[in-house]
Each structure stands twice: as C-alpha cells, then as structure tokens.
Amino acid sequence: ASRASAWALMGDTRLALAVARGSGRATAQLGAVARQAGNAVSLHGTGGAWIIAGPDADPTDMASAVYHSLDRKVCNTLNTMCITADRADDLVPPFLHALTAAGKRRGVNPKLHVAASSIGHVPSDWFTAVVPVARAEGAVDEPMAEPIDDSDLGVEWEWEDSPEVTLVVVDSVDYAVERFNAQAPRFVASLISSDAEEHERFFRSIDAPFVGNGFTRWVDGQYALGKPELGLSNWEHGRLFGRSGILSGDSAFSVRMRVEQSDPDVGR
C-alpha cells in the first residue's frame, strides 16, 4: 500500500517520460510498471565508476583521483580501479594509501576486493587483517581485503560508510577498456595518463558517456552543468537518447561528455 501511489504515477499513460531515481529492486519495479503502461522510462540502473591508470600515470595524480572519488557512495563513486602491470609496483602502494585515507576521512576502515589474477600485487597483511567494516547493520569484522573472481569486476559495491573498491592489475590500457566495455555498467571512466595520444585512443574506444582524466564524482548535472538534474539518461534498458547524458529540466538533448581536469586535487 505504501508504494501504490508511486505505481499509479509511473503507470499513468499521460506521462511523456517516467524518471526513476536511484537503483536496486524498487527502482527496477517502478520502471517495469511504467514500461508495461507503454511509457518511456529512464532508470539509473547499476552504477560505479572506473579509473584506469596507464603506463604514464603520475602516482600523485592517481592517488588524488582515487581519494576524491571516494568521499561518499553514489552512482559516480569509484568502484573499480585498473592499474597496468608495468606500473603495479609503484602505483599499487599510493592507491592503497589513498583508499586508506578515504576511509580515515570518514573515521572508518576501507574494504578492498582484489581480482584473483592480481592478488600477488597486494601486501598479504591486507588479506590477513580483520577490521571493523561499517555496514548498514553496523560494524562487522571482516578481512580488509578479499579476492574476487575476475568475472566480477563490474559488481557495484553499495557501501554505507567504509569505502569499498575493486582492484585489478591489467596487461594494458586497451585490455582495461575491453574489460570495461564487457563488464562495467558503461557509465563513468577516467584515464590517468600524461600521454595525450593515449587519452584520444581511450576516448574513442571506451563505451562510456562520461569520460575524464581525474576524479569521477564530477558526473552530476548540478555540479558539472549548473542545471537541475532530473536524472541520468537510461542505461538500464539501453541509451534513451542516443549516447546518454544528464536529463535536466531545461533540455531534452543528451550528449557524450568529456572533462579535462587540470587540477588533480579537485574534489567535492
């Protein structure tokens, strides 16, 4: 009964577009009601941003991007971190430091999921340390890091207070793009690299409507465009308006967006 009014609204055939904010089963159910009524619908679906650190990545810039992408859990929060194997020895440590710092900022421990193929790149004490992790039901004692299957890189971590991220070490930026296109929600992607040509290849090959070179939390209508955001163009059932973008109250157009961030310390 508590949801009857929402079902009635989404099923009203006078609607030109039904926008269901958020994600999860409740949002999917609202979308199903709208679609059954023949209404166009925009659902956020699965979120989670990816950051890829290439061979020319600056460790400090990468760490800043990670830290500022983990201030809170929303759809544009960093979810999956890819580091190329040739830089793993010098990029994994600052990544772990940034993840730890993001947790300390919130007064909690972080949670790390490591692709099975990449376990050897993370210090063993991350896997043996059992720490309180802030969950919805309260603090739960868990290993600070746990392995996951390489097929689970796109799983979105719906964390409460403890920043939760997947780490995978990849052969190349091109391979990371392949994994993104195959496993990610194809939402937000950021490349950390000082190679201009690599950025151009990245933009051409990655199937993401939002592409950047720093922190991922810029993907927001109010923050990036100064416009009231109704929602994000649908990626739950394909792109609603072509390539996707931000739905605002003053425009029905949707374009692919790219940010070139000059200050690596920008955050929200």
Where are the model-predicted features located?
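Short, surface-exposed connector motifs at secondary-structure boundaries
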Residues: M10-L17, V74-T77, N181-F187
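ALDH superfamily catalytic-core signature
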Residues: R25-E160
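Short, well-ordered beta-strand elements within core beta-sheets of diverse protein domains
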Residues: C82-I83, D161-D171, R186-L191
